[in-house]
Amino acid sequence: MPQRIVIGMTGATGQIYGIRALQLLRETEYEVHLILSDAGKINVSQEADYEVSEVSELADVVHDVKNIGAETASGSFRTEGMLIAPCSMKTLSNIAHGSSGDLITRSADVALKERRPLVLMPREKPFNRIHLKNMLEVTDAGAIVFPPFPSFYQGPTDLDDMITRTTARALSQLSVDVEVDEWEGLSSSHSP
């Protein structure tokens, strides 16, 4: 049986994180299932230098967000987990409150009920109290909230490097091993 990862892409800004996850997963043996929301499709065209068809080609299987009867809607369909990148506040709220109105939220609900990793990359700033409460709710339910904040201690060379490192860290929460440099501690020139 193949090892499967589900990628959900919602209408929040930051489509490059979902695209980069798909690109990184192409270098692995995982079977990748993509669910792209209608608003996500608009934002892919708006903010990324990709056509929706190009993004879809990065996945092994593409599911219609309205098809709540797709394989990923059932716990009997085994996956290694799910990453929602980017995750809109609407999607986060729906997951937090058990509202499974589309295939992304239903697949997330399945991940939680089956105790599979669910990683959410929320894209909003600043967070309001409702956002934070919803993040706490999904965390209490077993999800991992992973805002795409870049790290600087490894000396990223450019924005693309920051996106890759951040996305690779998110995928590592699903136990996906992708090739990026690991932190090796402070160099002797930076030690106190």
What are these regions (language model features)?
Residues 1-119, 123-192:
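A cross-family phosphate/adenosyl-ligand binding-site feature
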